[in-house]
A protein has these predicted regions:
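Hydrophobic h-region of N-terminal signal peptides that target proteins for export
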Residues: 10-18
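Positively charged n-region of N-terminal signal peptides that target proteins for export
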Residues: 1-4
């Protein structure tokens, strides 16, 4: 069997025990060798909750969008955007004092960095005032090239967002944004031109085809189809670039992160199917185990399931390099570890 190297950003560095298989629907891999020291942070720099992870178009570096060593960046002097080489060495960082709660991260075909700020002001912390609910485009050197959304404004206009979760840039430069993260936020996909001009939007809150309950992540296959991780509805939805619904796949649990490689293989992370409340009962209706599912975009048939050994799941972002190594990020984490799956 092909060997996969799976890298996670997670909190506890306590056990290298093999995960138990909890979902026998698919081929499960549970024999892990764990490396807790793959990503090498600058001296004294902690890693925080991390939803965003992406890879450069040349496949030579990994970018991470963490929450400034904590659960958000409010009041922090740390840079949340970080670049690493494929040996795990940190190369650069930038973006301090710009974000409330870092969320989505995407590297476009020119190597520019796109990020979403998933929260904004509240009534309790004045340090949040005037920032949040935006999407930024950076050069690889950290220069701001474009800003979408109004700073600190949660709205539903054509140039406003409310908790944007994800961003994706097509080969022609058009920009797609998954706008919303549950609650009272939006539930839609926004499309803009390469210059930031609004083109169209689709979606509303609900569970029908074309509706969303947390459009958490976006990916595009070689045919140009848009894949949406509709986490709150326990499904992946597929659209054309005009927002026309094509199909939906429920076999990926609660999809938090999506990645499609050069071979049109789809990688989906499920971070919350087994989350449980104070009574011990599931917080959602998904019957699946948490982990990574790998499938072809042709038919969605899952060929490999990597069970999540972390007790509370929270695996969100995922990318794969050209050698087939898999890298992922967790929001319940403040440490690094690497899995070699045999």
């Amino acid at each position: 069997m092909k060997r996969y190297s799976l890298v996670f950003l997670i909190m506890a560095v306590t056990s290298a025990s093999v995960a138990q298989v909890r979902d026998n629907r698919f081929n499960s891999s549970s024999d892990f060798t764990i490396d807790y020291h793959f990503f090498k942070m600058q001296t004294g720099r902690p890693i925080g909750s991390t939803a965003g992870i992406s890879i450069s178009p040349d496949g030579e570096s990994i970018w991470i969008f963490d929450r400034c060593g904590a659960d958000d960046c409010v009041g922090s002097d740390l840079d949340p955007i970080m670049q690493f080489d494929l040996d795990g060495n940190q190369l650069k960082s930038f973006g301090s004092h710009m974000f409330v709660r870092p969320h989505g991260l995407h590297i476009d075909f020119e190597g520019n960095i796109w990020v979403t700020d998933g929260e904004g002001p509240d009534d309790e912390d004045p340090r949040r005032d005037g920032i949040g609910h935006q999407v930024f485009k950076f050069s690889p050197e950290g220069e701001v090239l474009m800003t979408l959304g109004k700073p600190g404004v949660a709205g539903d206009g054509n140039y406003e967002f409310n908790q944007p979760s994800s961003v994706l840039v097509a080969p022609d430069g058009n920009i797609f944004i998954g706008d919303g993260h549950g609650g009272a936020s939006n539930s839609r996909i926004m499309k803009y031109s390469a210059s930031g001009e609004f083109l169209l939007s689709w979606g509303s809150r609900g569970s029908e085809p074309g509706q969303f309950a947390v459009p958490h992540d976006l990916a595009m296959d070689s045919g140009g189809r848009i894949f949406v991780g509709d986490r709150g509805n326990n499904r992946v939805q597929i659209f054309d670039q005009q927002g026309n619904f094509i199909k939906e796949w429920p076999q990926f649990g609660r999809p938090s992160g999506l990645f499609i490689d050069d071979n049109d293989m789809l990688y989906v992370t499920d971070s919350s199917s087994e989350n449980r409340g104070p009574t011990g009962s599931p917080n959602n209706s998904s019957p699946y185990a948490e982990g990574v599912r790998i499938a072809s975009v042709k038919d969605g048939s899952v060929t490999l399931f990597l069970d999540d050994p972390h007790e509370n799941g929270s695996q969100e972002g995922i990318v794969v390099d050209k050698a087939g190594n898999i890298y992922g990020s967790l929001t319940a984490g403040k440490a690094l570890r690497k899995y070699l799956v045999r």
